[in-house]
Amino acid sequence: MTLSHEQADYARKRIVEDGVADQVEIRVQDYRDVTDGAYDAIASVGMAEHVGEAMLPVYAAHLYALLRPGGRLLNHAISRRPGPRVRTSRTSFIDRYVFPDGELEPLHVMVAAIEGAGFEVRDVESLREHYALTLRCWVANLEERWDGAVTASSPGRARIWRLYMAASALGFQANRIGLNQILAVRPDHHGHSGMPRTRAALNGAER
């Protein structure tokens, strides 16, 4: 599910290449327009940052409604440090050139919205240091393929993304911004989650 036609086209190409086109459906659709279900699991990756704090309860409630009892939600999102929202030259740059609709929230705000919708939060994992390394790899890949990136977009757009990713890597490294995965479940009406009781079992280390 994406709002980007370019992402959808690329994803459709990849599922054909990987031989799973008969098992995967790629949609260009707003999450609020999804009404089919119920689903066993939902993974939301890099989307909650574009919802905004005021709409997070609506977002979480809609995902809850799409899941069957026992259904799981994995919410993967960038977060900011707690405290008042501060506008800086860095955030103004991102707002103007990278993510015009982006709005980072502290982790506890996201957890509260998910719990408020009826979910039980089962696990929270920080991937902050991982993402700093990932961003540095992306910058290196961009620089190695610079001419192709410029051809596909423009010199200015390529420079914007190189600057954004390099600066963001420093932000993650310094713990000014974070990246968290929240695993939650919709319990059934008896309170049963159907989830493993230990983290080792959750990660597949125990059977």
Residue ranges and their predicted role:
Residues 1-34:
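Class I SAM-dependent methyltransferase SAM/SAH-binding core
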Residues 27, 43, 74:
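Conserved Rossmann-like nucleotide-binding pocket used by diverse enzymes
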Residues 27, 38, 54, 163-169:
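Flexible, glycine/threonine-enriched loop-and-boundary segments that flank and lead into catalytic domains
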Residues 44-49:
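Residues lining the SAM
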Residues 57-72:
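A short glycine-rich, Lys/Arg-flanked "PGG" loop and its adjoining helix->strand segment in the class I
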Residues 32-43:
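A short acidic, Gly/Pro-enriched loop at the edge of an enzyme's catalytic core
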